[in-house]
């Protein structure tokens, strides 16, 4: 929120893309990031889990599941790239569809229509930090 407002205040929002990362695991998280002003999101862990779907069992019980997906992993040769690509594709497809459904439920047709006014929280501290509505506020 602060970065978005800073870019707008400096009148450079149209020249600099705001990319948000960290803690974005599911499409609901992605939508929140866009509502808070992100132009794009970077997902790390969730896509690694997606591409490793059903392959994460290969290194168990002696090695962690990540050993198949890391380029330097001890079991990188056991990773099926074709399956990983298919699982990643499905993750992106289902995430996009879930976001489309959520947008329709909010009466919106585009991510560009999202704003922080679409968000509400029951956490008073978060409401102040993110400058969004607080649900338990008495009127």
Annotate the PLM regions.
Residues 1-74:
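Glycine-rich phosphate/ribose-binding loops and adjacent secondary-structure elements
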Residues 76-139:
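C-terminal extensions of enzymes
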